[in-house]
């Protein structure tokens, strides 16, 4: 399915797309040991080959533009904690966790790190700028992978010009003293101010009734938005 998506981009967008396995990347860039930084070094290889000092702007058509990770990740890459017992690392790609891992609100897993390709980048995720777009399909099975690729290709081939293509949805809950809702609202306001052509929808969990079910808590009304 990864190759099927790559071929769709080659055909429709004229992109040069490489499909590689995680083991291939580990073998070349981390001596065969699974390491999230190996993904970054892999992309930096293409980046360094394209960038000639003093001609970055003129070499832009040769620079790598995107990295798509085809697999889910876990905060416990080694899967040695009880939360991940029973899972196989072979079914996941790795994720990069921030340096501060002692506080839940300051520790996070991010793929942004993989897009920091300049020589001086990587020491500060807060201030370094990404050089490529990084995305991830958080799939764990072949069925999930096929579904994601089917949806993506359907989106690429959809020629219907309607308002749905201009819609942006911000979803947040009230955890961590409303931090997530505050950040979502800041981003939504920035989009409305700088890109008025977009239709911004907000779905904030705390604005809906909290219902308890046999499987846990949910905001049923929010799922209908």
Please provide the spans of the model-predicted regions:
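Cysteine-dependent hydrolase recognition
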Residues: 1-225
């Amino acid at each position: 399915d990864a190759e099927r998506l790559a071929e769709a981009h080659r055909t429709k967008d004229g992109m040069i797309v490489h499909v590689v396995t995680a083991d291939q990347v580990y073998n070349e860039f981390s001596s065969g040991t699974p390491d999230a930084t190996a993904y970054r070094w892999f992309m930096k290889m293409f980046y360094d080959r394209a960038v000639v000092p003093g001609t970055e702007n003129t070499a832009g058509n040769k620079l790598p533009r995107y990295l798509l990770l085809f697999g889910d990740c876990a905060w416990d890459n080694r899967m040695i904690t009880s939360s991940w017992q029973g899972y196989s690392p072979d079914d996941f790609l790795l994720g990069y966790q921030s340096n501060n891992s002692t506080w839940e609100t300051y520790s996070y897993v991010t793929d942004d790190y993989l897009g920091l390709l300049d020589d001086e980048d990587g020491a500060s995720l807060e201030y370094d700028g990404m050089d490529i777009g990084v995305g991830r399909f958080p799939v764990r099975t072949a069925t999930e992978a096929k579904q994601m690729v089917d949806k993506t290709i359907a989106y690429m081939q959809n020629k219907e010009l309607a308002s749905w293509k201009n819609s942006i949805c911000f979803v947040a809950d009230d955890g961590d003293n409303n931090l997530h809702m505050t950040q979502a609202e800041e981003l939504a306001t920035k989009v409305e101010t700088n890109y008025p052509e977009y239709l911004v929808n907000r779905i904030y969990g705390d604005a809906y009734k909290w219902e308890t079910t046999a499987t846990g808590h949910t905001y049923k009304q929010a799922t209908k938005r």
